[in-house]
Amino acid sequence: MTKTITRVALIVVACFVLCGASLAAPRSAGVTEPPVFAFYPQAGIAWADLYFGNFVDLDPGPGVLDWSCGSQTYDGHSGEDSLVRSFREKRIGVPVFAALDGAVVQVQSGLPDEHVEKTMTQVDNHVIIASLGGHVRTVYGHLRRKPFVRVGQRVRAGQQIGWTASSGHSSWPHLHFTAKFDFQVYEPFAGACRTGQSYWREQPPLPAAPYAREFTFSPQPFGGRRDPPWDTAVRTGTFTRGTRDVYFRIELGFFGGSPMQVTFTRPDGSIAFDGVEATRLRGGRATWASWHERLDLDQLGTWRLRLAAKGRELADAPFDVDRPGKRRNRPPNPVSLSLDPADPTGADVVQCLVRTSLVTEDPDYDVVRYRYRWRVGAKLVRDVTSAALSDVLRHGVARPGRRLSCTVTPSDGKRRGPSAAVSVSVR
């Protein structure tokens, strides 16, 4: 087996040189502690298509300490870094939302948004919102060139304010989210080293085991990093019968670097290859690895590649072997939906969550985008296409007694998969 291993150093740094237009917000009395956030202000699902690369550094000295007593941060880091899976998703679009009602007090825009190298002098595109009479400020950093809001504008929780990008001091598309109470940074996550109340309505737990965030096959070698201009390898789920080079790549979260069990199975269930490969990857950060195997693809039909570590299956990836000239583009696989909260009131921010396999979103392993269409009764109130596995409808749009629905259609950019829908009566 020929093997290429790459570690993505996703220690993505947030650096805010707070410049651009600004507006002071009036202060009010009576607010004694930070509010609880109803949702994370970025489209996607935590520890699925969103990966938290860094939390707030709670160590006042030169060391590092995150809320779980781990080291998922760096010295002086002032917020949460939530990463999307690639620059391809960034270009499709991953929305960023206001976490609370408030007033926009600062906007920086118009700067390049696909940085892959970190330079301390680089300023990012960002938005700052003041809430609760100015006691709370939320910062949304590394955005695309053109945020959706302007200084002085009033916004509601769940309102889209921009798109995820990699502007400023950044090496990967992500949102840097900072929460401040009375101008002091605080950590919304609660745990062993940040005791007390969590400031998330539903705090996502840390993964208990490694998991696959993305997977693809290719008939060609992969390049190095997956940032612009990207490797030129063709994503595929179909190979031609014969002796072929099969390249495959997996992105992993919370992987500890243990040996990887690699097994190729023919359509009749027989084993074409079974081996253990060292990975040399270290845990804590998102990492990705690619290998290739020269296989005798001697049977037509659906083959499977299974990757496992420490007895845990990380990927079960099917691919087809066909006759020459039979390669085709297939639509994305079906998805299922849920709403959060499941029984919303008119005052709730509502999320539409997509459930799908992170390995087999698409049978050809294409990057999938999702069209979200929200309706209140028959009226279309939001229509957006993004690469994220969730979308958000701001509070106040759905009135009590009305029917709220979310319809999602997956697409690979050429073919649409089957639409899914979910609906509920608003209390």
For each feature predicted by the language model, list its residue ranges.
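Aromatic sugar-binding surface patches on proteins
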Residues: 281-294, 388-391
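Ser/Thr/Pro/Gly-rich low-complexity disordered regions
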Residues: 325-427
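Solvent-exposed serine/threonine-rich low-complexity stretches and specific carbohydrate-binding patches
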Residues: 272-283, 382-388
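Conserved structural position at the C-terminal beta-strand
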Residues: 307-309, 410
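Surface-exposed, glycine-biased beta-strand/turn segments
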Residues: 24-125, 157, 166, 189-245, ...
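Bacterial N-terminal signal peptides
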Residues: 9-20
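Short histidine-centered loop motifs in beta-beta connectors
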Residues: 90-93, 97-98, 132-158, 371-374, ...
